Regions:
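Transmembrane signal-anchor helices characteristic of membrane glycosylation enzymes that use polyprenol
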Residues: 5, 18-41, 130-132
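Membrane-embedded, hydrophobic transmembrane alpha-helices
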Residues: 1-15
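Multi-pass, polyprenyl lipid-linked donor-dependent membrane glycosyltransferases
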Residues: 98, 124, 133-158
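Membrane-helix interface and helix-disruption motif detector
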Residues: 1, 16, 87-91, 137-146
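Active-site lumenal/periplasmic loops and adjacent helix-entry segments of GT-C-fold
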Residues: 30-121, 138-140
Length: 179
């Protein structure tokens, strides 16, 4: 999958409009990988489940041992895809970094978009400042915070849905919110 994405990126390199912005995003994500680490209690709760998911072992009755094996975040399935044999579990925080960077960039685009109404721009600015002040380090939040950040983005899109009169934009918002 990575090689397919890299090939498509190289072939479509001439179609990228803002190449400097793309380099900035890639640099931020790369620095985030180097600096970030997992949450302090990651080894106690989420590591075992992510390793079990990545090794694809079917084990019955684990919920009888501990309640955390019965109820888990769906993001742990995503974390388990980043188990690489050489690096082992050191890339389990990659989805956290991807989501955090994407949400920060999306909210900053919403803040600077002059076509948005003032209320939406203030909401995006307030949400962006909250995220940047609350999560100054990547290790300060666990795997469940990503869902809450996505809810902030969903609330923004819901408000935009009710404030806009553009039918095409409403359809796009419904598709994005459904994903």
């Amino acid at each position: 999958i990575f090689l397919i994405g890299l090939t498509l990126f190289i072939f479509n390199l001439d179609k990228i409009i803002n190449f400097k912005f793309l380099i900035l995003i890639i640099s931020i994500i790369f620095i985030g990988f180097i600096v970030s680490k997992t949450h302090d209690d990651f080894a106690f709760y989420h590591l075992q489940q992510s390793i079990n998911f990545s090794k694809s072992k079917i084990q019955f009755g684990l919920s009888n041992l501990d309640f955390s094996y019965a109820k888990h975040s769906s993001l742990l399935y995503l974390n388990s895809n980043f188990y690489l044999p050489y690096f082992k579990y050191y890339f389990f925080n990659a989805p956290n970094q991807f989501f955090l960077t994407a949400i920060i960039i999306t909210l900053s685009i919403f803040v600077y978009d002059k076509k948005n109404e003032k209320f939406l721009r203030y909401f995006a600015l307030f949400s962006l400042s909250y995220i940047l002040l609350k999560f100054t380090r990547s290790s300060e939040y666990g795997t469940d915070i990503i869902g809450q950040l996505l809810i902030i983005l969903f609330i923004y899109l819901t408000i935009l849905f009710f404030l806009t009169n553009n039918v095409l934009l409403k359809k796009e918002i419904l598709v994005i919110s459904g994903l």
